[in-house]
Amino acid sequence: MTILTYPFKNLPTASKWALRFSIRPLSCSSQLRAAPAVQTKTKKTLAKPNIRNVVVVDGVRTPFLLSGTSYKDLMPHDLARAALTGLLHRTSVPKEVVDYIIFGTVIQEVKTSNVAREAALGAGFSDKTPAHTVTMACISANQAMTTGVGLIASGQCDVIVAGGVELMSDVPIRHSRKMRKLMLDLNKAKSMGQRLSLISKFRFNFLAPELPAVSEFSTSETMGHSADRLAAAFAVSRLEQDEYALRSHSLAKKAQDEGLLSDVVPFKVPGKDTVTKDNGIRPSSLEQMAKLKPAFIKPYGTVTAANSSFLTDGASAMLIMAEEKALAMGYKPKAYLRDFMYVSQDPKDQLLLGPTYATPKVLEKAGLTMNDIDAFEFHEAFSGQILANFKAMDSDWFAENYMGRKTKVGLPPLEKFNNWGGSLSLGHPFGATGCRLVMAAANRLRKEGGQYGLVAACAAGGQGHAMIVEAYPK
């Protein structure tokens, strides 16, 4: 019997799994605050012989907004174009020096399936600049970035723009399969008799719309259900999840008020006011959060709207270059993009444990340990997902039985973890979050005086990603 197929109704919070995944209590608010930054000593650089250094010059994003708000009348390429335009203004990079543009997205608008190309043309890039779009669920922007890293490291390109976009306010809603088939057959009919025969087969239930799938294709389970079962399997309580969500919103509000979210660029929405900041940051109270009912597994689940990331519209873009090219153009890069790793697990049993599996692999590849990391930036799909990953990473038993490791991965110190908020509070436009994570790590390293950042994320399909970001010397 696997972790997540253990019967939910027989798995109380104080289950035998809690004994396996012993961890310091997370239900103490004082432990969920970000501690003041500590200046770190310079460590070794991760430069590798005969491999080009790839640097982040800068990165921007549109404000991340709750779906159905100010961006609801736009198309995805409008948001992507805004991110590209913001990047051009921020960096003053000549459009003609950009060799390639790569964007990530998840739910594609059929009119602009290659949204990277349409956005690039709309932003004024040359029609001679190639662009393509990738999709890898919540790590689509990560894939866009690492594809760019590969093109630069191999010498194919010097200058790449990588980013991502998602517009959840207007997802494609299709006719039913029966209606689509009928319309296609009618289009092929060559006589009135054939058309009348086909029309006679029409039934009113053909008009029922087909909404975008919210469940995993391979398992038929929604991510929220999986998060609820994961939290139960790792004995993560409702209170712990609510406290972590409150931490995320509180830290995001503090960072927003102090002007630390410098990657956000204003966006003048056509026909509306200029949007200048994320609108999903809403610090509440544990008392208010406790009033919410379970969102997925009812009535006993612990995942709610308050401790889950919300549907978000937004776009991001980053300028990445070969180090020698950036310096030749007079830029002062923000960070190096170093080793990265992609992983995959069983989507039924371990859908959201990508960070647990990817973290030790990327650390070993880079020759680092958890103690070397100064800034952790993990994607927060759900509070329960983050806390379950914490418990898995801090468990020798899990490492031995599920990861084939002799010892546990280790627990990220909360005082270094998502100090400016995360996806729970800032929002999660599926295709754009990866760039936000990397820029948060890069900006935190510069602000806090650290050297290494670790970015990690889970994704639909049971996949995950982790990357090492190294601060560029001041």
Swiss-Prot record:
It comes from the Eukaryota. Residues 1-33 form a transit peptide. The lineage of its organism: Eukaryota, Metazoa, Chordata, Craniata, Vertebrata. GO terms for biological process: cellular response to lipopolysaccharide; fatty acid beta-oxidation; gene expression. Its EC number is 2.3.1.155, 2.3.1.16. One of its GO terms (cellular component) is mitochondrial inner membrane. The modification N6-succinyllysine is found at K72, K188, K190, K272, K291, K293, K332. It is linked to Mitochondrial trifunctional protein deficiency 2: An autosomal recessive metabolic disorder of long-chain fatty acid oxidation, biochemically characterized by loss of all enzyme activities of the mitochondrial trifunctional protein complex. The disease phenotype ranges from a fatal form characterized by early-onset cardiomyopathy, cardiac failure and early death to less severe, late-onset forms with myopathy, recurrent rhabdomyolysis, and sensorimotor axonal neuropathy as key features. Residues 173-220 dip into the membrane without crossing it. Pfam families: Thiolase_C, Thiolase_N. CDD domains: thiolase. The modification N6-acetyllysine is found at K72, K188, K293, K298, K332, K348, K361. It catalyses: an acyl-CoA + acetyl-CoA = a 3-oxoacyl-CoA + CoA; butanoyl-CoA + acetyl-CoA = 3-oxohexanoyl-CoA + CoA; hexanoyl-CoA + acetyl-CoA = 3-oxooctanoyl-CoA + CoA; octanoyl-CoA + acetyl-CoA = 3-oxodecanoyl-CoA + CoA. It is found in: Mitochondrion; Mitochondrion inner membrane; Mitochondrion outer membrane; Endoplasmic reticulum. Belongs to the thiolase-like superfamily. Thiolase family. It is an enzyme of class 2 (transferase). The record marks H428 as: Increases nucleophilicity of active site Cys. Heterotetramer of 2 alpha/HADHA and 2 beta/HADHB subunits; forms the mitochondrial trifunctional enzyme. Also purified as higher order heterooligomers including a 4 alpha/HADHA and 4 beta/HADHB heterooligomer which physiological significance remains unclear. The mitochondrial trifunctional enzyme interacts with MTLN. Interacts with RSAD2/viperin. This is Trifunctional enzyme subunit beta, mitochondrial. PROSITE patterns: THIOLASE_1 (PS00098), THIOLASE_2 (PS00737), THIOLASE_3 (PS00099). The keyword Glycoprotein does not apply.
